[in-house]
Swiss-Prot record:
This is Uncharacterized protein MJ1516. Residues 32-79 form the TM2 domain. It comes from the Archaea. It comes from Methanocaldococcus jannaschii (strain ATCC 43067 / DSM 2661 / JAL-1 / JCM 10045 / NBRC 100440) (Methanococcus jannaschii). The chain crosses the membrane at residues 34-54, 56-76. It is found in: Cell membrane.
């Protein structure tokens, strides 16, 4: 499952292509998402972690079904996994070797 859409991936790749390693590190630190915030948001308001990660549609679905309890628990897990995936994908794009 893609954490970022293709347009965002291309924009980031194009933006960092002329950066040195230190600039890429700074850019990564600015762009990455907090796993803790994503989990906390989904714990407090199911689906809010997904919205924080830019997955608004999924967040709304989880919010509307959270009264079933299982989607709420899934929302917490998914926020954690999605934030980790987003950051890993961001890292691989920023620090790719094919520049």
């Amino acid at each position: 499952m893609m954490a970022m859409n293709e347009i965002e991936l291309m924009q980031i790749k194009d933006f960092v292509k002329d950066m040195d390693k230190n600039q890429r590190i700074v850019y990564y630190e600015q762009k990455k998402k907090s796993v803790g915030i994503a989990v906390l948001l989904s714990f407090i308001i199911p689906g809010a972690g997904q919205m924080y990660l830019g997955r608004v549609g999924k967040g709304i679905i989880l919010l509307l079904t959270c009264w079933l309890i299982i989607p709420w628990i899934y929302s917490i897990y998914d926020a954690y996994k999605s934030a980790k995936d987003y950051n890993a994908q961001l890292y691989s794009i920023i620090f790719s070797k094919d520049d």
